[in-house]
A protein has these predicted regions:
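N-terminal secretory signal peptides that target proteins for export/translocation
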Residues: 1-19
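Bacterial N-terminal signal peptides
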Residues: 19-33
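Sequence/structural signature of beta-propeller domains
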Residues: 39-359
Length: 359
C-alpha cells in the first residue's frame, strides 16, 4: 500500500488540534496553579494575649497547650502548658502562671471536663525514652493547680503526642510515639487514681506527634510530621488501618506537620486546624470533607508573631470580651529575648480574616 499524505486542509486541522490541546493543557495548568494559590492564601491575625515564658531558658522548651473553659465565669478559664524540659504550667487568661508542677520531660498535654467528676488532664511523659508513660492529673479549677492521679503505660518507645477521647461512657487516651506508633489506652478512673489498659495499636509510617479526636464522629486525626494528617476510626474495636487524608503538599500545608485542633460545628461540620510549622502558619480544613479552607499566621502587634509552632489548642465559647467566640493558642518557638511561651488569638478574628481573604 502506498503512503497516504495528508492534504493541506488536514495538516491545518492537525495544527489547530495541537494548538487547542496545548491551550487546554495550559489552561489546566493555570487552573491548578490558581487553585493552589487560593488554597495557599495566608491571612494575618494579631495575638491578643500571651503567657509568661516557660521556666527553661535558652532552649526549645514550651511545646503544647490545653484549654479549660469556665462556663460559669469564662474570664476565669485556665490554660495548661508544657515545659518539655521541666513540667507543667497552669496559666490564667491574663498569661500569669499560677501553678507549676515539676514533672521532667513531659511533651504534650490534653484535658477533658467531666462535669461533676472534675477536669482530667493527661501528659505524655518521655523521661524514659524507651518506655512511654501517661501522667494523669486533676485540674483544681479553684486554685488553678494540678493534683496527681497516677500514671499508665503509653507503649514501648519515646512518648511524643497525646490526646483524649470520650467514647460513650469511656475515656480513652491515644499515646503517639516518636517512631509513628500509636497506642490506644482505655482509662479506668477511681476516686483519686487513674490507671490504663492498652486496647489497640495503630501506626503511621514515620515520626508523628500531634493528635486530636472528634468525639462526635469518633475520628482520630494524627499528624505524620513529613507526610500529612492521618485519619483513623477512634473506636477500640474498629479496624486499625488509617488513611492519609491530608498531604503536606508544601503549599497549603508545609512540613513539619505539628499540632492539631478542632472547632466543631453542628453534627459533623466545623474546622480542623493544623500547625504548618515549615512556614510559620496554620492551615484550616473544612469538616467533614477536609477541604482546604484557608491559612493564617499570627503576626504584628505589640506581642509579636509566632514561629516554628509545635502544639496548638482551640476551644469554642465566650472567653470574655477579648475572645467572644473562642480561644486559639499556639506555642511560640521564638520569643526572644525571653524564653518560649504561648500566644493567644481570638477565634472570631481568625474566622473574619480567613473569610475576608478567601477568593
Amino acid at each position: 500500500m502506498g503512503t497516504v499524505r495528508p492534504t493541506l486542509r488536514g495538516r491545518r486541522s492537525g495544527v489547530l488540534l495541537i494548538q487547542v490541546a496545548r491551550t487546554l493543557g495550559l489552561g489546566l495548568i493555570l487552573a491548578g496553579a490558581l487553585s493552589a494559590a487560593a488554597a495557599a492564601q495566608t491571612v494575618t491575625v494579631t495575638a491578643r494575649g500571651q503567657t509568661a515564658p516557660v521556666g527553661t531558658v535558652a532552649d526549645d522548651a514550651a511545646d503544647d497547650p490545653a484549654i479549660w473553659w469556665n462556663s460559669r465565669d469564662p474570664e476565669k478559664s485556665l490554660i495548661v502548658g508544657t515545659d518539655k524540659k521541666a513540667g507543667l504550667h497552669v496559666y490564667r487568661l491574663s498569661g500569669e502562671s499560677v501553678h507549676f508542677t515539676p514533672a521532667g520531660r513531659v511533651n504534650n498535654v490534653d484535658l477533658v471536663d467531666l462535669g461533676t467528676q472534675g477536669v482530667l488532664v493527661v501528659a505524655s511523659d518521655r523521661n524514659d525514652l524507651a518506655a512511654a508513660r501517661l501522667k494523669f492529673y486533676r485540674l483544681d479549677t479553684r486554685k488553678g493547680a494540678l493534683v496527681p492521679l497516677g500514671e499508665a503505660s503509653g507503649g514501648t518507645g519515646e512518648a511524643y503526642g497525646v490526646c483524649l477521647a470520650v467514647l460513650g461512657r469511656q475515656i480513652h487516651a491515644f499515646s503517639v510515639l516518636k517512631d509513628g506508633g500509636i497506642v490506644q489506652v482505655r482509662l479506668d478512673r477511681g476516686r483519686n487514681k487513674v490507671t490504663g489498659t492498652t486496647v489497640r495499636n495503630l501506626r503511621v509510617p514515620s515520626q508523628a506527634e500531634g493528635c486530636v479526636v472528634d468525639n462526635r464522629t469518633r475520628t482520630l486525626y494524627v499528624g505524620e510530621e513529613r507526610a500529612g494528617v492521618w485519619v483513623f476510626d477512634a473506636r477500640p474495636d474498629a479496624p486499625s488501618e488509617g488513611r492519609l487524608a491530608i498531604r503536606a503538599d508544601g503549599v497549603q500545608l508545609v512540613p513539619d506537620v505539628e499540632g492539631l485542633a478542632l472547632a466543631p460545628e453542628g453534627q459533623t461540620g466545623g474546622w480542623l486546624v493544623v500547625s504548618s510549622q515549615g512556614d510559620n502558619a496554620y492551615a484550616l480544613y473544612r469538616l467533614p470533607e477536609l477541604a482546604p479552607a484557608g491559612r493564617f499566621r499570627i503576626s504584628g502587634g505589640e506581642l509579636g508573631s509566632t514561629e516554628e509552632t509545635d502544639g496548638i489548642a482551640l476551644a469554642l465559647g465566650r472567653f470574655g470580651r477579648t475572645y467572644p467566640e473562642g480561644l486559639f493558642i499556639a506555642q511560640d518557638g521564638d520569643n526572644a529575648p525571653a524564653a518560649q511561651n504561648f500566644k493567644l488569638a481570638s477565634w472570631a478574628d481568625i474566622l473574619k480574616a480567613v473569610r475576608a481573604g478567601t477568593p
